[in-house]
Amino acid sequence: MPEFQDVEFIRTELKTGLTFSNIALQAKDAAKISRNTANARKAYDTLLRFMDRSMLSDEDLAELDPMLVRLKANLLELGEMV
């Protein structure tokens, strides 16, 4: 069973990554796009490493997977190779 803190960390990191990627997608300023894309990518990379080590329940995966898919799609749209 995963630790509650693990799931909360992953959930928070996903929301943070999605926020940064959404800001980048809506931005017009190149520096803002670049900065927020980089932050979203850091969140995504951290998530992949952390999720690899966490034993998430099926219920947790059902909640978190769609958010991870959305973050990956946003990063692809921003030109990231994920």
Language model feature labels by segment:
Residues 17, 21-31, 51-55, 78, ...:
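Secondary-structure edge/capping motif, primarily at the C-terminal ends of alpha-helices
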Residues 21, 37-40, 44, 51:
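Inward-facing hydrophobic residues that define packing positions of alpha-helical scaffold repeats
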Residues 2-7, 53-66:
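Acidic, Ser/Thr-rich low-complexity linear motifs
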Residues 33-42, 60-69:
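Short, charged, amphipathic alpha-helical segments
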Residues 1-27:
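Short terminal alpha-helical segments
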Residues 62-82:
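Eukaryote-biased recognition of C-terminal alpha-helical segments
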Residues 45-48, 52, 69, 76:
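Generic short alpha-helical segment signal, independent of protein family or function
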